[in-house]
Curated annotation (Swiss-Prot):
Protein name, UniProt field: Restriction of telomere capping protein 5
Region Disordered: start-end pairs: 144-179, 307-328
Top-level taxon: Eukaryota
A GO CC term assigned to this protein in UniProt: nucleus
Length: 623
């Protein structure tokens, strides 16, 4: 920037800066038709006070069709009021005038890139955090003091002191406030107004916190709107929320929020927010984008019905953008709920797996309680699916002392248990849900595992966590039938080489040693073992959650439900159906030959056609 622009900046008032940015968003981020629709929507619902048109909290909630049962209206309105003041945090909360609301829509739909060149996702998340946070030096200071107390034991007592917010303890770059305001700086820079930033337009995220209750309500809404399209109303997505559905949303929201370590803290600090979102919930806020795209479609407006009220603004003559016609009977988000997977857990999965591979794209392949808990049934139902799959397993922690011979046999095949469970003793009756995203077709393992670097291991309950594949080892997924070691289904445990397997087989009992971060289901599909060693070094990275920093655990659990879902459209399902039909025809042919049809002449002809006997009833040639 030149000298002249620096002199011009101080003459711009905050109102002028806000107006200038809104005008640039309008001219560069939207088409004329989209702007017309936005203006129509705003004017049709705006209240007026002292000549100023604005939207109130009830108006925003009514337009977005936010369910009253979630109580999230005030949280979302607070966020919008903050974003409406962008890029001047000192002016927040802003009155939601037409210009302020346009800035809100621009930021939440991520359309600001044509004006603000720095488009990093982290910068966008930082603005969302600020919109949700409250600034209380007393609360944040008490948390920082606790961080400092926890930082020292974390370094020396890895197992028990990993709980807490050690990652929020002061680190290099803690005081780099300019870095915290890059998006604000970029917006001001686009208007040659960086001088305003130097005069006090800063909002240090390290002196703030998102209240737990507010965050919980927002996560409930995000679970509900995760599958929404820009042309789909929230009322059509969830026409009525039953008490059971609200309770389910709340339960899963608690699981997700627990990943932020809020049990012993009043809220979520920025460092924890940024770390957890980046590591385990990268798509958490994606649903806000299509929700706020609703402002760009004028619904139920007919230009033939013009207002003649002289006090109303003159009506433009631009045509309205009609929302695309909705399909009367759209394909369901999930063909049918499983014993583990339902709509709410599907939304939870979409927070770290792309939604376009999940919603309306899943097919139930295998259910242990329906098809039988056996490796053969699993193979028959899953192996013909030539696309990615999602494996889900649910169970409860086994008691420390075996209560029957089956549990004793499991204990005998494992080394003595040194690691604690992931849940405290008082909560050991809680349901565990682990799972995996397998990007490749299933197969028998043989000498090497299958899967690739996009394989994901995860936990959905009682805490949300994601363990991404590493490049250190490629022992991603295996499917082994005895005597191949280790027998069963699993991820993250190395397959013994042929020589070592032979050496091990000479022992009367072969101990199974799980990988550092691994999931193993025994070959009876009766028990599961999830192991987490924070030092890592295996096929999957250890947990990146601050609350689990340097924490080791091993869950040995009895399997209650096991499911596999196929990711893919109708074409993949049709290919699988044809494969199953072919296999069924082959099996039927073999049964008719082996068991007989009851007609001796027909049996003889079938055997002759198969080359098993010759015309004189002697055995067929094998040459």
């Amino acid at each position: 920037m030149g000298q002249g622009s620096s002199h011009d900046a101080p003459h711009l008032t905050p109102e002028q800066l806000s107006h200038t940015l809104a005008q640039r968003f309008a001219s560069k981020s939207y088409t004329p038709l989209e702007l017309y629709c936005f203006s129509t929507v705003f004017r049709s619902l705006a209240d007026t006070s002292s000549g100023v048109r604005y939207w109130s909290e009830p108006t925003l909630c009514r337009f977005l069709e936010l369910p009253d049962a979630l109580g999230v209206g005030s949280v979302l309105f607070q966020m919008c009021s903050y974003l409406g003041a962008f890029p001047l945090p000192s002016q927040a909360p802003a009155i939601l005038t037409q210009e302020a609301l346009l800035k809100v829509v621009t930021i939440l739909t991520e359309r600001y890139g044509s004006v603000i060149k720095r488009r990093g996702r982290e910068l966008w998340l930082r603005e969302l955090y600020r919109g949700l946070a409250v600034y209380d030096r007393g609360v944040s200071a008490s948390i920082e003091e606790e961080h400092e107390r926890e930082a020292q034991p974390v370094a020396t007592e890895g197992e028990s002191s990993g709980m807490g917010f050690a990652i929020d303890a002061p680190e290099d770059g803690e005081g780099d406030e300019d870095e915290d305001d890059e998006l604000v700086l970029a917006a001001l820079d686009s208007m040659d107004a960086v001088e305003v930033f130097k005069q006090g337009e800063q909002a240090n995220v390290h002196h703030s916190i998102i209240p737990t209750d507010n965050f919980l309500k927002l996560v409930e809404l995000l679970l509900l709107i995760a599958p929404i399209d820009a042309q789909q109303s929230l009322s059509s997505l969830a026409p009525e929320l039953s008490d059971e559905r609200v309770e389910e949303l709340r339960r899963v929201a608690h699981v997700i929020v627990s990943a932020f370590g809020v049990e012993n803290h009043p809220g979520v600090t920025y460092r924890t927010f940024n770390t957890v979102i980046s590591a385990a919930l990268p798509y958490l806020f994606n649903g806000l984008n299509p929700l706020f795209e609703h402002f760009l479609f004028a619904k139920d407006f007919d230009l033939s019905k013009r207002k003649n009220d002289p006090s109303s603004p003159s009506q433009d003559t631009h045509p309205v953008i009609p929302p695309p016609k909705t399909v009367m009977d759209p394909e369901p988000l999930l063909p049918q709920p499983g014993e583990i997977l339902n709509l709410t857990l599907l939304s939870q999965l979409s927070f770290f797996l792309k939604g376009n591979t999940l919603f309306r794209r899943l097919r139930p392949l295998y259910s242990g309680n329906n098809h039988g808990f056996s490796m053969g049934s699993f193979e028959k139902q899953v192996f013909n699916w030539r696309a990615p799959t999602i494996l889900l397993v649910k169970g409860r922690v086994l008691p420390a002392t075996p209560s029957n011979t089956r549990e004793r046999a499991l204990q005998d095949m494992l080394p003595p248990k040194r690691l604690p469970n992931s849940v405290p003793e008082s909560q050991e009756n809680q349901t565990l849900i682990y799972g995996a995203y397998i990007p490749t077709q299933w197969k028998h393992t043989g000498k090497t595992c299958f899967g690739d670097e996009s394989t994901v291991l995860f936990q959905l309950s009682p805490t949300h966590d994601v363990f991404k594949a590493s490049k250190f080892s490629t022992d991603y997924v295996y499917f082994n039938k005895s005597p191949t070691q280790p027998p069963g289904i699993g991820l993250g445990t190395p397959i013994p080489t042929q020589s070592s397997a032979h050496t091990h087989s000479s022992h009367s009992q072969t101990l199974f040693r799980p990988g550092p971060v691994s999931l193993h289901l025994d070959d009876a599909l009766e028990f599961g073992i999830f192991t987490h060693v924070s030092d890592g070094g295996g096929s999957f990275h250890p947990s990146a959650l601050p609350v689990r920093k340097r924490r080791d655990w091993q869950d040995r659990f009895e399997i209650e439900s096991l499911e596999v879902w196929g990711c893919g459209g109708d074409e993949v399902a049709e290919a699988q159906r044809k494969e199953w039909a072919w296999q069924e025809r082959e099996a039927e042919a073999r049964r008719r030959i082996n068991l007989g049809t009851g007609d001796q002449e027909l049996d003889r002809e079938l055997l002759k056609m198969a080359g098993i006997i010759s015309g004189d009833r002697s055995g067929g040639s094998m040459g």
